Amino acid sequence: MARQFALADVIGERDWSVDLGAGAVTFGDDLRFPVQLLGSESHGDNTWLWAWANEASNLPPALLHLCAWMRDYGRNAGVGELTDRTFPLTRADGHRLALLASGLTGRPYYRGPYAGGALFFHLEGVPPTALPPERALTVISQTISAFPFDHRTGVTAFFEQQGWPFSGGVAHHPGGATINVAFDDQGRISQLNGSLPPRG
């Protein structure tokens, strides 16, 4: 989720356009990034279709490396949602699958809506943007509300990815902000708060 917030800060409200031949997405008139396709949602029958399984669209093989890697990862890990060609969105939707891929690759994703569905793809070469301390609480809160996962492991990984030292339930931002996290006996977040240093 942190990568998604950072991406949103970069692209703002710009329109998007994908050039499959060039393997790139354009945002507005000034931003262009290489892409790797993940798959698409159909709003007609509420299903997900992996890009590697979308033979009818004759997608360029060079844009399918990531989704093919995800399929192989799913085979090794025994995750059917990564190996089945298509399935209902009630089983797993595009956001969940794209976030999983983002966690494995460290790249942000984009959901490109179109008439009847949406295309999901990863972006390469997006400049890294540090998440402001005041946004960290929002990211953690929204993530634990939207997705089932081990809170302790997820929070620890989040602070590590952001470069915040985290020990004893306290994360320290280099700029002086702190976030306090407490967990219950089942490893779920029971308390979450933070403080910002006074602005000079």
What are these regions (language model features)?
Residues W16-A22, P113-A115, F166-G169, D184-D185:
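Short, ordered beta-strand-loop transition motifs
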Residues P132-G200:
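Alpha-helical oligomerization segments
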Residues V25, A118-L119, V181:
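Short non-domain terminal segments
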Residues E55-F149:
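Surface-exposed beta-loop interaction hotspot
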Residues D30, G116, P174-T178:
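Glycine-centered tight beta-turn/hairpin loop motif at sheet-sheet or coil-to-beta transitions
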Residues A2-V10, R91-G103, R152-G163, V170-H173:
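Short, solvent-exposed secondary-structure boundary motifs
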Residues M1-D72:
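N-terminal leader/presequence regions that precede the main folded/catalytic core
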